């Protein structure tokens, strides 16, 4: 469905960071997918610090959403997403969901909402972030009438994505390897009852 201006509801929108000034134009196609990313990702399974999940609560020093927002706001950066999930699980909207993000996934910007999970320098994520991924994706699926299906297991870049509600950047771009966002993020949705397709 095409949408007018959409903002995340409470409790997700704990803080709305300013919209990134370079955000794209209004959508001319319906939202068909959520594309999940991690800020670091990793290029392949040989990465020296593969992703891991930290069970403890994130300390303030781990919360980097405002740093990511500032980086994406620079005029020399083309990347961006609609939503950030910080280390403590806080969800930040940084672009109107009714617009296409300027650039988060080649070929899918017009038909998807980009969600970036903030990763630590050692590639780790916090368990609270996975809880927020599930809650946010569930809300997005309800709001945009998306199927509760997730691209799992990872099989490389997919030629066909019809009927898949949530994809990883890794499923759509050959230069992302298996780690953007990585199995932990995708498995959280399957564990919450989403269909693996």
What is the meaning of each model-derived region?
Residues 1-109, 177:
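N-terminal catalytic cores of peptidoglycan-degrading enzymes
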Residues 1-15, 24-29, 121-197:
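Basic/polar, cationic surfaces and motifs that engage anionic cell-wall
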Residues 100, 114-125:
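Substrate-binding clefts and substrate-entry loops adjacent to catalytic sites
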Residues 33, 112, 165-167:
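Structural preference for beta-strand elements that scaffold enzyme active sites
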């Amino acid at each position: 469905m095409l949408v007018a201006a959409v903002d995340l509801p409470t409790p997700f929108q704990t803080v709305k960071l300013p919209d990134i000034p370079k955000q794209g134009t209004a959508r001319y196609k319906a939202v068909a997918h959520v594309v999940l990313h991690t800020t670091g990702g990793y290029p392949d399974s040989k990465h020296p610090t593969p992703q891991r999940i930290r069970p403890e609560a994130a300390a303030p020093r781990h919360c980097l959403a405002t740093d990511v927002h500032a980086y994406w706001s620079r005029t020399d950066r083309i990347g961006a997403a609609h939503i950030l999930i910080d280390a403590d699980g806080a969800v930040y909207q940084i672009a109107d969901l009714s617009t296409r993000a300027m650039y988060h996934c080649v070929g899918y910007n017009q038909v998807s909402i980009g969600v970036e999970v903030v990763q630590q320098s050692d590639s780790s994520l916090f368990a609270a972030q996975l809880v927020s991924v599930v809650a946010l994706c569930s809300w997005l699926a309800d709001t945009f009438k998306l199927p509760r299906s997730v691209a799992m297991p990872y099989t490389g870049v997919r030629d066909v994505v019809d009927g898949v509600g949530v994809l990883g950047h890794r499923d759509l771009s050959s230069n992302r390897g298996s780690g953007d966002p990585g199995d932990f993020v995708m498995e959280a949705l399957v564990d919450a009852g989403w269909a693996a397709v």
